[in-house]
Amino acid sequence: MKRLRPSDKFFELLGYKPHHVQLAIHRSTAKRRVACLGRQSGKSEAASVEAVFELFARPGSQGWIIAPTYDQAEIIFGRVVEKVERLSEVFPTTEVQLQRRRLRLLVHHYDRPVNAPGAKRVATSEFRGKSADRPDNLRGATLDFVILDEAAMIPFSVWSEAIEPTLSVRDGWALIISTPKGLNWFYEFFLMGWRGGLKEGIPNSGINQTHPDFESFHAASWDVWPERREWYMERRLYIPDLEFRQEYGAEFVSHSNSVFSGLDMLILLPYERRGTRLVVEDYRPDHIYCIGADFGKNQDYSVFSVLDLDTGAIACLERMNGATWSDQVARLKALSEDYGHAYVVADTWGVGDAIAEELDAQGINYTPLPVKSSSVKEQLISNLALLMEKGQVAVPNDKTILDELRNFRYYRTASGNQVMRAYGRGHDDIVMSLALAYSQYEGKDGYKFELAEERPSKLKHEESVMSLVEDDFTDLELANRAFSA
């Protein structure tokens, strides 16, 4: 199937002014377009324009937007809906039907204006939002086009076994967009279409073998919006280097599964072992301390990290397992008293009310910081990683601590979601305890961590839209030619 390309006339009808990277994507006729762009660079907007163009320019076309989750798919789906409703006011030979809850959009095409006598429906174009976390639901369809959003987070098997076969009958096209996540299949597909020569941030660029069906596009966020470069460079000061390079620089980083890429900047301190405690320094009356408390149950360890807020160094770390709730709280109270009644930041999620009641009963000054979601965990860990890269994290020079930090990694779930956890059957109690403690630390550059509020999921509801407006375009074929290059 020959891919039609949208024209400037079509862009004008949408009120859309593509920047140079978006325009290159639209002008490409490759069957597999791979766009690796930084955040807020217009990937989703360009993808939505491509979908709308197909729905109008090729009556009867069938296409999907597929993302790691339905919430992510809904972003581009929603943009497509907005644009389709706008265009339906221009073309009286079309009728739009939206089923919001099912993420299903229909564009009915007629042989004359819909409200004209004898109007006959000649074709129906369909666009649907899909999630990659249920691959079996992607099988069996026959499609003209597919858009993959955040493709680097989707397992390759979902593409090869479920998605690509849907394009085989009609020789359909795929637009594969994402920020990079290491050197996975998205990286390999990107190299198959990259013809830009050697470029920093793209390993093996310049020596890669290309495929005639592929064309790739690459740009950091500041390449697209050069006037905002200063803002992006400022952001670099507040997020981990690895995250910045991937999310904004659109770099393919080979060691991206390691959460703490700044381990070489970690300050290691001599300590004295006293029972279950690793003591770097005893209490200093003129200093303020806080304790990050990660409680363990069953085979997990409980870890209490005492942070000197004046120096930014861990003064003491206590690690134990097999202790009852009462025993854990008793030890935490003793540790707090030994460091001037240091206040405690405690992860109370998943341990029930028993811990909170025990903390209250013991009169411990504590702030609950429940790590109740992957979002909260990621924010805490990212803050610790950022401080580490700045050389502002100091811990006892202990093999167990270093191994746990080194083995804390990014993983991809079967549904394509990225999670942080210990390697294999390892523990992450030390990591979480340190992250809780350092969430209270004001860095040497004045940076202070603040936990962002989680946004509630949007409610979905059934919605039906019918738009019939007459305009100069009265003939469907003429209308199609008007915005097809």
From Swiss-Prot:
Q: What is its EC number?
A: 3.6.4.-, 3.1.21.-
Motif Walker B motif, residue numbers:
145-150
Q: What is this protein called?
A: Terminase, large subunit
Q: What does this protein do?
A: The terminase large subunit acts as an ATP driven molecular motor necessary for viral DNA translocation into empty capsids and as an endonuclease that cuts the viral genome to initiate and to end a packaging reaction The terminase lies at a unique vertex of the procapsid and is composed of two subunits, a small terminase subunit involved in viral DNA recognition (packaging sequence), and a large terminase subunit possessing endonucleolytic and ATPase activities. Both terminase subunits heterooligomerize and are docked on the portal protein to form the packaging machine.
**Which residues of this protein are annotated with the site description Modulates nuclease activity?**
D300
Domain description from the entry? The N-terminus contains an ATPase domain. The C-terminus contains an endonuclease domain.
Positions contributing to Mg(2+) 1 binding: D294, D429
- Originating organism: Thermus phage G20c (Thermus thermophilus phage G20c)
> Active site at which residues?
E150
Arranged from A to Z, the UniProt key words for this protein are:
ATP-binding, Endonuclease, Hydrolase, Magnesium, Metal-binding, Nuclease, Nucleotide-binding, Viral genome packaging, Viral release from host cell
Cell inner membrane recorded as keyword: no
Gene Ontology molecular function: ATP binding; ATP hydrolysis activity; endonuclease activity; metal ion binding
Q: What Gene3D superfamilies is this protein classified in?
A: 3.30.420.240, P-loop containing nucleotide triphosphate hydrolases
Q: In UniProt terms, what is the effect of altering D347N?
A: Complete loss of nuclease activity
Residues engaged in binding ATP = Q97, Q99
Cofactor(s) needed, names only, are: Mg(2+)
Q: Which residues bind Mg(2+) 2?
A: D294, D347
Spell out the GO cellular component terms annotated for this protein, sorted alphabetically and separated by semicolons: viral terminase, large subunit
Is-annotated flag, keyword ATP-binding? yes
Similarity comment: family membership = Belongs to the Tequatrovirus large terminase family.
Name its GO BP terms in alphabetical order: chromosome organization; viral DNA genome packaging
Give the enzyme class.
hydrolase
**Co-factor: note:** Nuclease activity requires 2 Mg(2+) ions per subunit. Also active in the presence of Mn(2+) or Co(2+) but inactive with Ni(2+), Zn(2+) or Ca(2+). Cu(2+), Cd(2+) and Cs(2+) do not support catalysis.
Motif (Walker A motif) on chain: 124-131
Which residue stretches belong to region Nuclease? 256-438
Site Possible stabilization of Magnesium 1: which residues? D428
